[in-house]
Amino acid sequence: MDKATIQAHKISDEEYEEILKILGREPNLLELGIFSAMWSEHCSYKSSKKYLNGFPTKAPWVIQGPGENAGVIDVGDGVAAVFKMESHNHPSFIEPFQGAATGVGGILRDVFTMGARVVANMNSLRFGEIRGESELAKKHRYLLKGSVAGIGHYGNCMGIPTIGGETTFDPSFNGNILINAFALGLCKSDEIFYGKAEGVGNPVIYVGSKTGRDGLGGAVMASDSFNDENKSLRPTVQVGDPFAEKLLMEACLELFKKDYIIGIQDMGAAGLTSSSFEMAGRSGSGMKMYLDRVPMREVGMTPYELMLSESQERMLICAKKGFEQKVLEIFRKWDLDAEIIGEVTSSGVMQLYWHDELAGEIPIGPLSEAAPVLDRPVARPKYLDEIANLEIPNNIDNKTAFFKLLKEPEVLNKSFIYDQYDANIQTNTIKQPGCLGAATIRIKESGRAIAMAAQCDPRANFVDPKIGAARAVAAAGRKVAMSGAVPLAITDCLNYGNPQNPEVMWQFKEGCEGIKEACRELNTPVVSGNVSLYNDTDGISVYPTPAIVTVGVNEDANLNLKSTFSSEGRAIYLLGETSGEFAASLYAKALFNVVGGKLKEVDYKAERALWELVIEANKEQILEFANSVGVGGLAITLAKMASISNIGVNCEVKFKEPNFIFDESFSRAVVGVKDEAKFEALATKFGVKFEKIGVSGGKRFKLNEIDESLEDVREIYLNEFAKIVKKED
């Protein structure tokens, strides 16, 4: 094998030596391509696996933790919630519409392949600078519009509501955008399907769309940095067909009602290669596959292309022997391709045939369960010492600061985005995009509700990767708790830069430690997740962005707690300690272009007490609303609530310094109280600091010296974002 071919497959010299040992010979091109895909960062997690070990993954309500297509938790009454978050960062930067659309398609397959009907989508999106007339801003407006259109197109065509998410902007994402997709489905807790292939002689069946050349090398592309040489990689981006996926989902759900199969796996990154090796690897089995039987969309396709294509809307099934025709009939009824392409063996080896000739033979273990794990060098970044001392002037009046922060893209209402998503299809949505807080759906059969919230502050993770990651877990959980639901588990999408940079690996290591700590302390285990590395361009990495989605359950869907005002004259209370924390704050960034300071550790006792107080007060029906205090502090939190509800506020709060209305002290919330005496007694019992700061009502936004027309505040908050994004329209 010539060196140029090996290098083109991103195989290091050490890895090639290991391949020679495994095979006992030189690999052919097909085998090299398979090793390249399965040992890519995207498939093998070779740089991250060391630090993922030790994540809390167990609890009485956890049915399936990491290692399968998606995580599964018990949500009561014999119902299970199946959910996961995935990234499609690199493809979306190259071709935003198809990249984002197929990201949605992939996460949907991960969920419904477990036997669940998907009932909710969410997303977590990061873009660079979108304001102004620079070519960079124009590019990111294009990326934003394309990605959002792709997400909406796929979800809407599938008939699945997109009910929430988060979108933020920072120059650190100028060279790499982050597109993270989340899906949640429901099924019976005793009817879950797994990605395994076992039982010698059991047939292996290919179902779904035909295989083409789209997406070739996608897994390897997603495991590399961007530079001037590889920015035009459109052929590596898959092309999605949501209508084909809708048929595939319905066919799979029909199949799951029968006892015909052993296991089923989505063909995601690395296509037929990853699905076959993962299914056999989990079971310790071997497999024979006859690649000339694979349904092909293009003529002249080779075994190499068939194994590595990432054509969408495809699944691999291990059926029970004797039931293969029943399986084929179901998929053909739905007008999908379905062919028997192989069988399970006991050899522990993958044997690939092309017109009855052996084209490739590889042991399965070293490419699946026993894939290499790297111990990359780590080094604490030098920049941390440079940014540790945050000094910001106190020379800007609060009115000026208020409007400056209100106009920041990450603050502004994102109706331009979520209006492209159908949030109400399936008629289960209780709380949808634009309402603040956790998104919520009802489980009609049980009367319960599932709340879910996405959260991550990249600036906080840049300033302190461990505390920042812990805060993401806590903040996502708090949003769920503020809806009245009990947070139960998380899924994560860990977006970091180039792992070959020791400082990036240190950020990743610290981020994992923060997640472990927070999940243990808050009793929200990790049940699924994804790692996306190489989010860097020309040596510049994105801010560490460990996106978290927390899922929780409210025993009574009728007690879902709102996040905004719904009446006038309601007492408003601020819960938690305000200590003047401006580290990594929007105030420091927007007004002084400074990102730095020292984050305070998460006070888990205070965080848990806040959750428990609001959940209990909601059960006693003494709250009208509850909302987490987040970016921009109390002032921006109240401005959002007033704008959405079209109800003013009149608040006066005694802080040490006037600008503390913008501070981002952690573990705080704003609540509307119906019975003040009862609530204050309850808050005292739980040990949560409280202060009555005002009332809702009127058409003014009043907070200390800020006294503005609510109409003016609403005009900015509700309409400014669309004006920014639509500049070229």
Swiss-Prot record:
NCBIfam families: FGAM_synth_II, PRK01213.1. ATP binds at Y45, K84, D492, G529. It is found in: Cytoplasm. Pfam families: AIRS, AIRS_C, FGAR-AT_linker. GO terms for molecular function: ATP binding; magnesium ion binding; phosphoribosylformylglycinamidine synthase activity. Keywords: ATP-binding, Cytoplasm, Ligase, Magnesium, Metal-binding, Nucleotide-binding, Purine biosynthesis. The gene is purL. Mg(2+) 2 binds at D110, D266. Belongs to the FGAMS family. InterPro entries: PRibForGlyAmidine_synth_PurL, PurL_linker, PurM-like_C_dom, PurM-like_C_sf, PurM-like_N, PurM-like_N_sf. It comes from Campylobacter concisus (strain 13826). Mg(2+) 1 binds at E86, N530. GO terms for cellular component: cytoplasm. Part of the phosphoribosylformylglycinamidine synthase complex involved in the purines biosynthetic pathway. Catalyzes the ATP-dependent conversion of formylglycinamide ribonucleotide (FGAR) and glutamine to yield formylglycinamidine ribonucleotide (FGAM) and glutamate. The FGAM synthase complex is composed of three subunits. PurQ produces an ammonia molecule by converting glutamine to glutamate. PurL transfers the ammonia molecule to FGAR to form FGAM in an ATP-dependent manner. The active site is at H42, H88 (proton acceptor). HAMAP family: PurL_2. This is Phosphoribosylformylglycinamidine synthase subunit PurL. Signal peptide: none annotated. GO terms for biological process: 'de novo' IMP biosynthetic process. CDD domains: PurL_repeat1, PurL_repeat2. Monomer. Part of the FGAM synthase complex composed of 1 PurL, 1 PurQ and 2 PurS subunits. Substrate binds at S87, H88, N89, H90, R109, Q238, E310, S311, Q312, S532. Its EC number is 6.3.5.3. It catalyses: N(2)-formyl-N(1)-(5-phospho-beta-D-ribosyl)glycinamide + L-glutamine + ATP + H2O = 2-formamido-N(1)-(5-O-phospho-beta-D-ribosyl)acetamidine + L-glutamate + ADP + phosphate + H(+). SUPFAM superfamilies: PurM C-terminal domain-like, PurM N-terminal domain-like. Pathway: Purine metabolism; IMP biosynthesis via de novo pathway; 5-amino-1-(5-phospho-D-ribosyl)imidazole from N(2)-formyl-N(1)-(5-phospho-D-ribosyl)glycinamide: step 1/2.
